[in-house]
């Protein structure tokens, strides 16, 4: 019996550990490094391992369900006419968990407490799903307070009070650095799939993830989740590569703010935006955004009009000339972005983006032809595909 158990553990360790290594801005991130991979045996042990200061490779080999573990709250939530009532909408709306309700009315609500407080991930951690079994249900992950060198790979984070705005965030970065978020799936979240700020997120690679916005409760009243990615950190460098964002309706992503000293460089490459009922990119001030090889299919607004006026610097690579003009500063020809059945994609070629990107040349990832994006991304993004 002991021999069988030992064989199973050894097989598990061999099968599930970090696959590959990050490219782009999170290059060099090692997470738990050479620590022996191990699967926790209880929720308490899972939380302890994630939050302590010991380097670890934590295997998620089952569904860890936090719903109900910290009780529920029954009280009043705010119902807003435009996001909750949804007259004429195709889905239910989202009520708001908050202490004010200007312009709305109070309604009775009941929500789960566990989702409101994410697990704080310690430094030098790899949190890795086994096959397609790794699920964290009802609670998110947060890297903050100077913690760094974290890998989150092959995990499905789901069911954080999806019927309520402010119901919970899946992944939070706040005063962090060296974070690789790879081959995960995020679905049915109350607030943001990924959020950064107000402190720095640091050097981050977000690659090969599936952002699944299908929901029965939508602030856009259209069955598509609105709160996708909100990037507001003080000094942030993002590689956003090979991700599949589908059936969402906003902040996909939003980046930048004038409320802090936020400074963001964002390199978006070979991502697939599919069936977006609202906007994809929404760019504010103090940002430098290089976009190439992204495919927008059935996206109502690939780039908001506000993005063109808010002061952010954009290189949208929408023409052959714009693609070729990358060569002088970056040393390669950029890949153009492609639209199918989508709204307008504005041509912006701010030289400041190329100048800044040239200083990060070693962190710029390569691209493949944009025509290949839908098939390759769908085949590769999400859990069970590492």
UniProtKB/Swiss-Prot annotation:
GO terms for cellular component: extracellular region. Glycans are attached at residue 124. GO terms for molecular function: pectate lyase activity; pectin lyase activity. Disulfide bonds join 77-101, 326-334. The keyword Acetylation does not apply. It is an enzyme of class 4 (lyase). Its main location: secreted. GO terms for biological process: cell wall organization; pectin catabolic process. Residues 1-16 form the signal peptide. This is Probable pectin lyase F. Its EC number is 4.2.2.10.
């Amino acid at each position: 019996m002991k021999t069988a158990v030992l064989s199973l553990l050894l097989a598990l360790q061999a099968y599930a550990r970090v696959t590959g290594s990050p490219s782009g801005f999170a290059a060099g991130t090692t997470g738990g490094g050479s620590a022996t991979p191990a699967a926790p045996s209880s929720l308490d042990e899972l939380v302890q391992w994630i939050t302590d200061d010991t380097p670890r490779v934590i295997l998620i080999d089952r569904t860890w369900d936090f719903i109900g573990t910290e009780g529920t709250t029954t009280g009043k939530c705010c119902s807003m006419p435009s996001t909750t009532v949804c007259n004429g909408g195709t889905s239910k709306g989202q009520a708001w968990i908050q202490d004010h309700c200007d312009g709305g009315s109070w309604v009775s609500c009941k929500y789960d407490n566990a989702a409101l407080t994410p697990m704080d991930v310690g430094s030098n951690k790899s949190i890795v799903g086994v096959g397609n079994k790794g699920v964290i249900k009802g609670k998110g992950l947060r890297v903050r307070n100077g913690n760094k060198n974290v890998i989150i790979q092959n995990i499905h984070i789901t069911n954080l009070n999806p019927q309520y705005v402010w119901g919970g965030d899946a992944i939070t970065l706040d005063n962090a650095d060296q974070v690789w978020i790879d081959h995960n799936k995020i679905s049915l979240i109350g607030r943001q799939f990924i959020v950064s700020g107000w402190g720095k997120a640091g050097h981050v690679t977000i690659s090969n993830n599936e952002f699944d916005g299908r929901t029965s409760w939508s602030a856009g009243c259209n069955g598509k989740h609105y709160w996708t990615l909100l990037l507001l950190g003080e000094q942030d460098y993002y590689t956003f590569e090979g991700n599949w964002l589908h059936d969402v309706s906003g902040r996909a992503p939003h980046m930048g703010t004038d409320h802090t000293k936020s400074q963001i460089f964002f390199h978006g490459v070979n991502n697939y935006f599919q069936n977006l009922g609202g906007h994809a990119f929404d760019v504010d001030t103090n940002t430098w955004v290089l976009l190439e090889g992204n495919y927008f299919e059935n996206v109502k607004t690939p780039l908001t009009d506000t993005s063109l006026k808010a002061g952010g610097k954009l290189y949208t690579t929408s023409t052959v000339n714009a693609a070729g003009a990358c060569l002088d500063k970056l040393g390669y020809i950029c890949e153009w972005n492609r639209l199918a059945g989508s709204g307008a994609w504005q041509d912006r070629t701010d030289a400041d983006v190329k100048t800044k990107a040239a200083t990060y040349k070693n962190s710029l990832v390569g691209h493949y032809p944009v025509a290949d994006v839908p098939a390759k991304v769908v085949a590769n993004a999400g859990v069970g595909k590492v």
